[in-house]
Amino acid sequence: MNIMEEMNELLKAPIPIYSGLSGVEVKAIIKEAKLLISSRFHGVVSGLSQGVPTLCTSWSHKYVELMRDYQCEACLLDSLDGTKGVSVIDDALLNPQKYTPSKESIQHIEQKVREMWDTLL
């Protein structure tokens, strides 16, 4: 039994555990999430770009900059302060709109990406 299965057994309401999925399948699952908590850069980008309330741990400056781009600086979890992290997660579940990137910030990032590709191609 792996650590995810062990942790899942401790929950009052176990959650689905997925593995072996393609990137497209993962993105589809993220889009349906009520809340995404990720420490993987592409997972965080997927959540933010799809307007999913997204929390992340920041072990690199990339995450701080990404959250700033989406105007979601409050969505960074301090991996050294578990008590505060639990409070933020609880608040995100009760008030997801506070942790959801605005449509304007998503559109702004999408426009910047289009401009980048236009320049490159």
Where are the regions a protein language model picked out?
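Active-site anion-handling motifs in enzyme catalytic cores
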Residues: 1-121
